[in-house]
């Protein structure tokens, strides 16, 4: 244990390459039981000579602050832990940080200038691989709120306050007004079609696999079950403060301009509390910021149909990095899949290999344009880095979705 956080470390017995890969796991719920999670890349890492390490973090919930601090602490403790276990090792020649979902937020935040300056445990990383990450930090929660507000508005049950105290009571009526089934998102009503158009634009614009993602009932249910919550992110922020802000959001859907303008003028706008997520003197923020201030190679992966951490997170990340002059350190890749983090191990392994080569040789790998609307709308968008090859370490969900004929082909 490091404090109250458990950890797991594996080092190849005979062929360690002198390099360490540190894994940041995703959201593990709001219970008290902590657990270390193995990365799906475990076999790849060990077979290729990498040591790997992962923390349980000292807290669950959406506690990215704990994730950053505990992951950094484990990275710094690697050599001492190895020595205590009878295997003294040289300091790693390279240290890579990678993670999924909330772990993608942790990965991207840990390499930011702000977190590097304020963290209690100042670990250095040579390259980072955030996958399906919350790369726009609190903008994800703005998106969830905007989605809910749009649904209520289109259902004729508009919100007048946030959070809406009546949400649980009216949620069934909202669903009925927008979808032809209470158990499926695949067949929207006329108003539901407008909602689908709004969500498409909120999540990144017209692109392949969005239709399959919007119709992904399991993931949509997770999103809708989160509607009605306060903006304190399940108590992560103190004093009932809220980071949610929808003032800048423009809702776009297929209708005459006057109709769209009226919709935008009448929908409830949420204003964040100004000091909800301040800088702290005892470590990183409760919800660490991703400002685009990083100076190491970063390669990202994101699925096109993700409704839980949508593709627009990649767009926000690039815009922030560009504003800080750091876009040259960033490569982004789109994957044609309809769920959250449902990459094949082959896709992850290729990304890690390319990142390591970039760090060690200076040769920057290729990636996708994540901003140009006409590029995203092309039928083959996302084909370049999608690899439907599955193996023993892939999840059942990934194997099901990547089966031939399940998704639009890249031919």
Put a short name on every predicted segment.
Residues 307-313:
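Conserved alpha/beta-hydrolase "acid-adjacent" motif
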Residues 198-245, 336-411:
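Alpha/beta-hydrolase-fold serine-hydrolase catalytic core, especially in secreted/extracellular enzymes
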Residues 98-107, 128:
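Gly/Ala-rich beta-loop-alpha elbow adjacent to hydrolase catalytic centers
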Residues 104-119:
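Short glycine-enriched nucleophile-adjacent loop
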Residues 121, 131-288:
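Accessory cap/linker subdomain of secreted extracellular hydrolases
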